[in-house]
Amino acid sequence: MMHELDLRPHLARFAQRPLALLAWALLQGTSVNAQVAQVAPDEPPLPLKTSPLLQEQVAPALRSSLPTFISAEHIFGRPDLETVLEGRAELRRGDLVIKADRLEYDQPSDLATASGNVLINRAGNVYEGPLLELKLDTFEGFFNQPRYYFLKNDAHGQADRVDFIDDQRAVIHNATFTTCRRLPGPSWLPDWILRAASISLDNEEDVGTAKGALLSFKGVPLLPIPYLSFPLSDKRKSGVLPPILGLDNVNGAEVSVPYYWNIAPNRDATFTPTLMSKRGVNLSSELRYLEADYAGQVQLDLMPSDQLRDSTRWGLTYTHQATLQNSWTRPFTAGGVALNLNLNRVSDDNYWRDFTRASTGSLTQRLLTNDASLSWTEGNFSNTVRTLKWQTLQDVSAPITPPYDRLPQLATRYARSNVGGFDYSVDADYTRFQSERSLTLQPNAQRVFSVLQLSRPWVTAAGFITPKLQLNVSNYQFDTPLSNGARAASRVVPTLSVDSGLVFERDARYFGMNFRQTLEPRAFYVNTPFRDQRLLPNYDSGAVDFNFATIYTDNAFVGNDRISDSDLLTLGVSTRLLDPATGAQVARFGVAQRLRFRDQNVTLLPTDAPVTDRISDLLLGAAVNWDPKWAFDSTVQFNPTTKQSVRSTIGARYSAGHYRTVSAAYRYQRESSEQLDIGWQWPINDLWGERGQELGAGRGQGEGRWYSVGRLNYSMQERKLVDAVLGFEYDAGCWLGRIVLEQLQTSTASANQRIMFQLEFVGLTRLGVNPLKSLKDNIPGYQYLREQTSPPSRFSNYD
């Protein structure tokens, strides 16, 4: 029979020497049989209070002063000298539990000795073995022949001995380490196991360090590791990361050995030297920082000698965001000035083609932005000072005209709303446009424009109408004369528009389901007189894409160099089906079309023909989410004259739960492109009826599961795969295997291919090329089989 003593209420003065409580009890003749307090039926229940003992981490300063609870079948000893517990002996204090057949405590040395079926549970970490010696206050001691389990990463193993240095650090000698679930039976062997001469554990930093280690997989020695640092949780730590191996048809075999430097909680850096068999050595570095009023990231790739190009290659990306608040900003604004930097530079025109998987995705584009701006607001004013410079990476087979640099751009806006029912705003902008005239065939210039806008919205639940008057004023000063000899030009363009719409609602029932259905007709009229703009250079204007978002706008161009002459009426109607209980949209259908009352003579280029069609293409759109698992959307641009589709997009997605998603999209543009895009992630075991377990996102679906992942982009015009990602993942519980093939097209005649193979030993490390970024970027709805979640509570492994 077990008896328990709770000595806390009467013996607080012995709290610093916990087991001395027992000696005092023996002297006082306290019965070993604990007495249970009785509460009178008419007394109110005792109120619950928060306790520091229920915190996930017990503070070290608090731990030594906590009360101790002991129990055993037999308790005896000498006061102030020793106490002995025999038979199911148990000691509890804070987050520490010690169980054994026999437990001795020597009070002068504060040394506890436990023998026979000894178990320690400290904050969820468990050690079991035959013999323990431990100083309770300092947690110094040793444990012979222990078996152990660590809560944070679900790892376990056994060793010859554990030396406890203090309450946060320990050294395990001749140790094993694995996260594979132990199965019953003496013949069980884990799929992977790390054997080490010693493993040092630092629970304060959540870091484990193995020395003289050997990693075995499926019983085969895989990799000797003289030194390995691994995490005990998801906490960041400095150290060498697992090597990354790769095979590329352009760069050849690749070997990378990253080093991560955890500079501070708000700063870190990663250095990654990479050896490419065909090119040479590439040095990559990344620095991140985060402060209360600024944050940023710097990435630099340097290849001192590219053997294929016989030159030095480099790429730089720098982003920085800050809020400046000091003496020189106060005259402008009390809220501070926002600073934004986005700088991207590379060594040469071929960088984007040769390094398609650069550490910064922005460097794989052909137009690289270098943008710096200051912006601030004060009352109804908002202001921006900006410089924008482009680096254009030219391709001989497909040259592009570089956009204009803005050196500088000054913009301000003043806006008021609901002033006697009216809304008005004034926008002003000064920009200096600069580029290579030999490429743009236009003079550099300074442009000043201002847009004045006045509107009077009437809005009710049943509809709205908003008349608006707009005046666009522009002035140009050219560095060199235009073709007509002019060195300056001006333009004033007024615009009148009226936007209106109605909303009708009714209860409806379709396919046995109740809905709230809306009918929303909309009419938009715009009138802008013609102003001859054929001689004006074009610095920042382009044609507006024709879609549902732009069909109700007053200008056929974006930018400020072209203002289209318009006499248009846009008519459209949409209907929505809403869930009457939640208001969620179940389906939406829409149609819209423009009616043109006169020709549009303003065009993007002087050689372009005027727009004479009286009726525009018809836009048809639909989006259906009838079932939470299914999503369907489609947009069709139909030409009523030719009776043909000009552009169509049809997409569907099926998501049956975690790790089960399939998406398909068809995109067609007449005389330009026709593509089919399919992406998926799906458990292969479903094919033979094994549904797996529903463990939630980031935890997989149980052991022994295969997953197929991929995305295929097929050009039906060229009859070939443009881009492709295809692979398989295997989840064994304690390890994951991935093999992925990737093809990225870099030009009409060339593509980069690579194979990515990775073994992830859960809770320890990864070996191989990491395909996860490629899978996440390319496959819609892709989910990681393992993803960092909140650490488990110590009470989940409570004794």
Curated annotation (Swiss-Prot):
Q: Which UniProt keywords apply?
A: Cell outer membrane, Membrane, Signal
In terms of InterPro entries, this protein maps to: LipoPS_assembly_LptD (IPR020889), LptD (IPR050218), LptD_C (IPR007543)
- Any GO BP annotation: Gram-negative-bacterium-type cell outer membrane assembly
Superkingdom assignment: Bacteria
Subcellular location, record wording: Cell outer membrane
For this protein, the record's Pfam families field holds: LptD
Which region is the signal sequence?
A: 1-34
Main location per the UniProt record: membrane
Q: Name one GO cellular component term.
A: cell outer membrane
What assembly does the database describe for this protein? Answer: Component of the lipopolysaccharide transport and assembly complex. Interacts with LptE and LptA.
**Similarity-based family:** Belongs to the LptD family.
PANTHER family (UniProt xref):
LPS-ASSEMBLY PROTEIN, LPS-ASSEMBLY PROTEIN LPTD
Q: Any idea what job this protein has?
A: Together with LptE, is involved in the assembly of lipopolysaccharide (LPS) at the surface of the outer membrane.
Annotated protein name in UniProt: LPS-assembly protein LptD
Species of provenance: Albidiferax ferrireducens (strain ATCC BAA-621 / DSM 15236 / T118) (Rhodoferax ferrireducens)
